[in-house]
Amino acid sequence: MTNNFMAPEAAAALLKAATADGRPIAPLRDRLAIADQDSAYAVQEINTRAWLAEGRRLVGRKIGLTSLAVQAQLGVDQPDFGMLFADMAVGDGEIVAAGRLIQPKVEAEVALILGRDLTQERHTYADLIRATEYALPSIEIVDSRIENWNIKFVDTVADNASSGLFVLGGRSVRLCDIDLTACAMEMKRGDEVVSRGNGRACLGSPLNAAIWLADVMVRCGRPLQAGDIVLTGALGPMVAVKSGERFDVSIEGLGNVSALFA
């Protein structure tokens, strides 16, 4: 390794510091000795272990890059995942304090709450449906520790899949009572509709994304467990956030959820 490149531990330290002090860093993809998927997840895992050792509580996972268009843009053929910690949760309608995030954007998603562990090497629809306690409407508030969102696959994976915060709606719905493939989504900023979509935008169905995640988590040695929250991926385009804005999301059959920014 030459002095021009850094080890995963050094990259993880840069991202961890950026998370703590709110100052973004330059992209990592040209600074890692080996800039591939395995290296990116190694960086993420280093910080996951560090945060767990510091007492942060792991409560679930998020799935990113579920749009085929975004995958093509980043030159990949699969989604990615990141960790959800308890201190990332924001109440429905709760104000997100200014300065808590660096360059936030919002996405409307279906959240699944698991009632059983998912530990099979390869899961089926039946496995997932049986394991899911209920679904909730959600807003993922994504963020990037990389300057100006100048990201490629390696950057976002290393940066915990560009995780920030998340908001869950308060109305739980059983999977038998909703069509997650056809459900329509509308997001408003104030009175203006800024994003529309449906379940098909998320790998054809949020359930497809969740099955992908369940299989990957078993291979990674961190299988999904009862009680975990799974943010299954965006149902429509993400929207940048400015101070003072309010976002209201409605997902057909699931209900509403809101995020407010100071």
Swiss-Prot record:
Catalytic activity entry: (S)-4-hydroxy-2-oxopentanoate = (2Z)-2-hydroxypenta-2,4-dienoate + H2O
Needed cofactors: a divalent metal cation
Pathway field: Aromatic compound metabolism; 3-phenylpropanoate degradation
Listed GO MF terms: 2-oxopent-4-enoate hydratase activity; manganese ion binding
Tagged with keyword rRNA processing: no
Disulfide bridge map: none
E.C. designation(s): 4.2.1.80
Entry keywords, A to Z: Aromatic hydrocarbons catabolism, Lyase
Stated role: Catalyzes the conversion of 2-hydroxypentadienoic acid (enolic form of 2-oxopent-4-enoate) to 4-hydroxy-2-ketopentanoic acid.
Protein family membership: Belongs to the hydratase/decarboxylase family. MhpD subfamily.
Family annotation (HAMAP family): MhpD
Record-given protein name: 2-keto-4-pentenoate hydratase 2
Protein source organism: Dechloromonas aromatica (strain RCB)
